[in-house]
A protein has these predicted regions:
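Nucleotide-sugar donor-binding/catalytic module of glycosyltransferases
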Residues: 1-202
Length: 202
C-alpha cells in the first residue's frame, strides 16, 4: 500500500453523539494526504452505522468494528499497528481540530529531526466551557498550580540529550499532560518504542 503522509486514528466507543461532526471536520481539512483509521470498540449505539457510511463515501477511511469491548489501551494499540502514514496521531472522538493543525505540526517535525512530538494548545468548548472559565476566575487554577508544581517540573526538566527512543519513553510516561498524548508523532519511531506496559492508569 502506498504510504500517506499522515495517519489519523480515532479510537471510539459509543461515540455517535460526536462522530459525524468529528469525521466531517477531518475530511474538510485543506490537508488531504492522510488515512483515517476508526476503531470501534464494541459500541452498542449507532457508531458502526455512522462510520460505515462515511467509509463507503471516502476511500481514505479505514473502519474496523470489533464485536466486544477489548479495553481502551488495546484500541489505541490496534490503531497504531494498522497505521501506514509517515506521521501518526490519535485524536479523541469529542475533540475538534482547527484548520491548519496537520500542516503546522508536520512542518515542525520535518524541520526538527530529533523532536519527540509536536502538540498544540488546548481550548475548552461546549457546555462545560463556562464551568472552567468560572473556576479560573475564582483562583482555581492558581491553587491547582501550587499542588502540581512537582508534576510540572517533570515537563520543565525534559531531557534534551540522549537517544530519540529514551526521550520518547520519558515523554509518554509524563503524568498530567494528557492533551500532549494527542500530538503528532513519527510513526516508525513510535512503533519501535510503544509498549503496553506503559501505565496510563497511574
Amino acid at each position: 500500500k502506498k504510504q500517506v503522509k499522515l495517519t489519523i486514528g480515532i479510537p471510539t466507543y459509543n461515540g455517535e453523539q460526536f462522530l459525524k461532526e468529528k469525521i466531517t471536520s477531518i475530511l474538510n481539512q485543506d490537508f488531504t494526504d492522510f488515512e483515517l483509521i476508526i476503531s470501534d470498540n464494541g459500541s452498542t449505539d449507532a457508531t458502526k452505522e455512522i462510520c460505515s457510511n462515511f467509509a463507503i463515501k471516502d476511500k481514505r477511511i479505514r473502519f474496523f468494528s470489533h464485536k466486544k469491548n477489548l479495553g481502551a489501551v488495546w484500541n489505541f494499540d490496534f490503531i497504531l499497528k494498522k497505521a501506514c502514514g509517515e506521521y501518526f496521531m490519535w485524536t479523541a472522538v469529542d475533540d475538534k481540530i482547527l484548520p491548519g493543525f496537520y500542516e503546522k505540526n508536520i512542518e515542525i517535525l520535518e524541520k526538527n529531526s530529533n523532536v519527540v512530538c509536536s502538540a498544540s494548545q488546548v481550548k475548552y468548548f461546549g457546555k462545560n466551557r463556562n464551568y472552567w472559565v468560572e473556576r479560573s476566575t475564582r483562583g482555581y487554577f492558581k491553587a491547582l498550580k501550587k499542588k502540581m508544581v512537582k508534576r510540572f517540573q517533570n515537563l520543565q526538566n525534559y531531557p534534551v540529550s540522549g537517544t530519540f527512543q529514551s526521550k520518547f519513553r520519558y515523554y509518554l510516561k509524563l503524568r498530567g499532560h494528557h492533551h500532549m498524548f494527542y500530538g503528532m508523532y513519527r510513526t516508525e519511531q513510535l512503533k519501535k518504542i510503544w509498549l503496553l506496559d506503559v501505565n496510563f492508569t497511574e
